[in-house]
Amino acid sequence: MKMIIDGKKVDSLSGETFDVINPATGKVIESVPKATAEDIELAVTAAVKGQKEWAKTSVTQRADILHRFVEIVEQNKEMLAQTLCAENGKPITEARAEIGNISIAFPAFAEHAKHFYGTLIPQGTEAGQETTLQLVTREPIGVVACIIPFNFPCDLYDQKVAPALMMGNAAIVLPSSDNPLTLMKLTDNRKLNIAIIIYQISQKSWCTRQLSIHTCCFGNCKVERHCGLWICSRNGNG
């Protein structure tokens, strides 16, 4: 399989790959690209550009796209469940349930975003503002790095990617290198314009450090303790 950067299926610029192993059989399922710092730079650059266009779409348009995404997931849910079972090692019943959660979570975030209103502050609430009506609106952060742990990859994908997209952000998806295949298949959706928004990079610990230089929001800083400490130390040093 290949990574997806700027809506295109690509290999690593280094040409390096690593194997995804079935934990039950010890056999290789698939080989995936091993991302380099240069690959991440390309993904970040494309995400910044794509986010500006994505942010121009209305909340209802974004919701429609996510609902179409769910329809395609439903059409391929058994294939996705079998992939998740093979690469993750969880029983097929649990894999099917986790894939089924996509059709619950994505619509839920899509519909919630439609009612995520701004705030109106009446006149006189603050001293000196007796005649001023203040309106607080919500704006996208920009690019969100969605770091996905190995244990519930699809559930965490739902909880990070769906709200990020619905609020007008771009999302760079960084799956666990133990089991990236299901998320790569989810992201490889050629029928949707969503491909310009989500980017797939095969995860290694240093990828987190590289991304932290650029992105202003992390979906999860607990993927690896030393990476979390590195991010904190960097923030502390300005």
Which residues are covered by each model-predicted region?
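N-terminal Rossmann-like NAD(P)+-binding subdomain of aldehyde/semialdehyde dehydrogenases
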Residues: 1-131
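Rossmann-like NAD(P) dinucleotide-binding subdomain of oxidoreductase/dehydrogenase enzymes
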Residues: 118-238
